[in-house]
Amino acid sequence: MAIEIITGLYIGNKIDSHNTTFLKSRKIKIIINVTTEIQFLKDCENLGIQCIRVPISNNYENYEKQNDEYYYQFRDLCKLIDLKLHQNKNILVHCSSGKCRGSTLILAYLMYKLKKLDHNEIYKILETKYQMVQMDKHVFLDAIRKWNEELKI
């Protein structure tokens, strides 16, 4: 089941992204799908949900390229999340299982908002709220480190 990390921002998995009862009850207006392989719910338009795809693959053979692709999207994605939350639009961020790709974006957003804390401190905060988080240190750690450095400038 998806978890609300901060007011209006949820992390979940592919099942949550297709659960219309959950989407309606939490008033989700934006779904950010951090996968290449999972289709959006067909009723999104009828439910008034905006769908955004962040095409990050589950194939980690070329993880250096994946890190760069993800890192270069962080700023725009964080600004978008911030804008939509300020418009009181609830957001579900998901990947396949909710453990790595989606959690990475949530971590990047929390880093964007809580600039005084480093990524390790924010990861611990995220982990207390969402025990499913399993950041694959070999896959997105470089992107998170770069993002951490950029935010400190």
Model-derived segments and their meaning:
Residues 2-91, 111-151:
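Cysteine-based protein phosphatase catalytic domain of the PTP/DSP
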Residues 89-107:
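A phosphate-binding catalytic loop at a beta-strand-loop-alpha-helix junction
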